[in-house]
């Protein structure tokens, strides 16, 4: 795959929103997939397909039902309007009083048979965590999610994700993704100096330097 093309395929927006729990940060990803909306919807919502490109998921798959992804977030299905809109709460671990975190996926079919995919994550964030990492804290992970979905829709896959995560290709992807979220943060009104620190911290987290080899 061409890592630069994969990064550039995503449009990123960083903003703010009012929620019942107070002011939240928002990250929005937009990408066009060369697949009909019905196929994209099925890939995103079918528990048999999700493990092929994302994570195994269990739960009660109806509005008001609860779900859990393996080793990751869980929550409640808030809205489901096939094949256009899915909104869920997105909680890591136990819910925090006064917390707020929702993910909304929106699909728009195009006349040429492609589908515009939008994912918006709205969350009341810990101010210290935002200051340290900025939008890349969740944005890099969502970029990887959209990469996996694109490969799946194209009939491709990363055979051994754990090995790939340690590869130079994965480090390049995470580094470029972190920089792209930094640019989106500046466009969203963050200070360039603050963003430089956020990007450096996010890059170190997602793409740490490989351990040095034995001394000669």
Model-derived segments and spans:
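Terminal "cap-and-tail" regions of soluble proteins that handle hydrophobic small molecules
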Residues: 1-21, 122-216
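Short beta-edge strand/loop motif at the mouth of beta-sheet-based domains
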Residues: 20-22, 28-29, 35, 47-79, ...
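Hydrophobic/aromatic beta-strand elements that line small-molecule binding cavities or substrate pockets
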Residues: 31, 75-78, 102-109
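Hydrophobic alpha-helical segments that drive targeting, anchoring, or assembly
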Residues: 31-33, 68, 73-76, 90-92, ...
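Short, surface-exposed beta-strand-loop junctions and turns on beta-sheet-rich folds
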Residues: 48, 85, 94-95, 123-125
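Short strand-connecting beta-turns/loops that link adjacent beta-strands
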Residues: 82-83, 110-113
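Ligand-binding pocket scaffold of soluble enzyme catalytic domains
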Residues: 88, 99, 103-106, 110, ...
